[in-house]
Regions:
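C-terminal alpha-helix
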Residues: 463-471
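Short beta-strand/turn micro-motifs at beta-sheet edges
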Residues: 375, 435-439
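Conserved PLP-enzyme active-site core in the AAT-like
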Residues: 148-358
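Conserved N-terminal alpha-helix of the aminotransferase class I/II PLP-enzyme fold
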Residues: 1-157, 165-168, 181-195, 201, ...
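Pyridoxal 5′-phosphate
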Residues: 450
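Active-site C-terminal subdomain of aminotransferase-like
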Residues: 6, 19-22, 26, 277-429
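A structural signal for short secondary-structure junctions
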Residues: 379-382, 441-445
Length: 471
């Protein structure tokens, strides 16, 4: 894992697949090699956009100086000089903004070029989008209808599109202050920093011990506050703010409230009645078999501020490829059942971790520090599938010995574990200033994040137990 983060060739060459926003899929690599062969004279790196507007957005914000652009029938090709600063910037942009081609889209293109045939069998479904929206709207609560839901190519694309639209709204209102409440997911932090630049200021309240400052900030800055961005609960420490209080403060000062309940799912964390916009990564829970990237944006009809963004957001998002929607439509009928089962398994796993002598700390939705805030919204026994923890012994020995899939994702039928801080914030782990920020946020570099799958709880506990014996 460290070799991957340090981009050691001997590690990267063995990495055949990975989370699509971090590791380029083999189908996209094959397509890239095909187009590079058409231009052998130029040592370029090739990028693909399913939505040409995403290239316009990237060009505008990154100020890329050298690029050769080719418009194909249903996608855009951008050639950038390899190993250039522009190339590195665009790679980061793809990760943080959640754009590009899906592997199924690339495979369809390769099939049309006669390079390879489509190997996957997906049930054709002209109503796939409607099927997905129907189930996702119900998960958010009775106040949400399918018409209130937009589907996007990824969860990151959902947030990026909403925040872009919110910045336009804030500029019109002459508001220049945003608050990140709780430690947010890496790409949410990065895309906010990238988009804000010099036109706005961001205040970070990373730890629950700082949440009380939010009222002071509103009292001090009042009408200058454009909005609050929070996860409910947060990633990876599963902290939850007092969302009712935050809603009241936003209403008093006409501020936008953007909430992402992905960690526990919108089915568990019913945040819609308190939010102006709800972001959700359908890659988790809905895609419980782990082979589709997708996101959603929900606009609660009670929120005039949220509804005012809907048209702009709909023009900014990149819609999922039709085969990805068909694949998601095959899985999503089991969404409710998957969440119910993993809720119950999670309760057993948390009890096991809390009672184990080699476990130092456990972080989950109902933890003592902020659990009451989560319970006020979700009720009891709905923790979602994610729990984070620290071990008392050797973190390295435990992780290396753990007989479980290692992945940065969650919400799949197979249990997953990852050393979250190393994966998401490696630059911080390797710098003194970064370590100070992590420490202030209560994030141990040796934090482990576990996603509980559909295996029997005893099987999951056995895997953990064997590794804990060796740490």
């Amino acid at each position: 894992m460290v070799g991957y983060k340090e981009k050691k060739p001997e590690i990267l060459n063995k990495l055949k697949s990975g989370y699509p926003r971090f590791v380029r899929h083999q189908r996209i690599n094959v397509l890239s090699k095909y187009w590079n062969r058409q231009k052998p004279e130029a040592p370029n790196e090739t990028f693909f956009f399913s939505n040409p507007k995403d290239w316009d957005f990237a060009q505008n914000i990154l100020k890329i100086s050298e690029a050769e652009v080719e418009q194909q029938e249903k996608y855009l090709i951008v050639h950038i000089p390899g190993r250039s600063k522009d190339c590195a910037k665009l790679h980061k942009f793809f990760q943080h903004a959640g754009v590009g081609l899906s592997s199924r889209h690339a495979e369809t293109i390769l099939d049309s070029l006669g390079i390879l045939s489509i190997g996957e069998s997906v049930t054709p479904n002209l109503a796939a989008e409607d099927d997905i929206k129907s189930i996702i709207s119900k998960a958010h609560g009775p106040q949400v209808s399918p018409e209130d839901v937009l589907l996007t190519i990824s969860g990151a694309n959902a947030f990026t599109s909403v925040f872009r639209a919110a910045l336009i709204q804030a500029k019109q209102q002459q508001k220049k202050l945003w608050v990140r409440l709780g430690w947010l997911y890496l790409d949410t932090i990065e895309i906010m920093d990238l988009l804000v630049e010099n036109q706005a200021q961001i205040i970070d309240l990373n730890h629950p011990d700082e949440f009380y400052k939010l009222e002071e900030i509103f009292n001090t800055y009042g009408q200058d506050i454009a909005g609050i961005v929070t996860e409910f609960p947060s990633n990876p420490l599963l902290h939850s703010c007092d969302l009712v209080k935050v809603r009241q403060l936003c209403d008093q000062h006409n501020a936008l409230l953007i909430v992402d309940p992905t960690m526990a799912s919108p089915k568990n964390a019913k945040v819609t009645t308190l939010s102006d916009v709800v972001i959700n990564s359908l890659t988790k829970y809905a895609n419980w078999e782990g082979d589709v990237m997708m996101g959603s944006v929900v606009f609660p009809t009670h929120s005039d501020k949220g509804m005012a963004l809907k048209m702009t957001v709909s023009e900014m998002i990149t819609c999922p490829f039709h085969k990805d929607m068909e694949r998601m439509a095959e899985q999503i009928p089991y969404y409710d059942n998957f969440i119910d089962r993993t809720n119950q398994s999670q309760l057993e796993i948390v009890e096991y971790l809390n009672s184990h002598p080699k476990i130092k700390r456990v972080y989950w939705a109902y933890q003592q520090s902020t659990g009451k805030n989560y319970r006020n919204i979700a009720g009891d026994d709905k923790p979602g599938c994610v729990v984070s923890f620290e071990v008392k012994g050797s973190f390295t020995n435990f992780y290396n010995a753990l007989g479980m899939l290692k992945s940065p994702s969650f919400g799949t039928e197979f249990s997953l574990c990852c050393p979250y801080v190393y994966l998401a914030h490696y630059k911080m782990v390797t710098s003194e200033s970064g370590l100070k920020i992590l420490n202030h946020a209560g994030l141990s570099t040796e934090l482990l994040r576990l996603s509980v799958g559909l295996e029997e709880p005893e099987e999951i506990k056995e895997s953990l137990d064997q590794a804990l014996k060796l740490c």
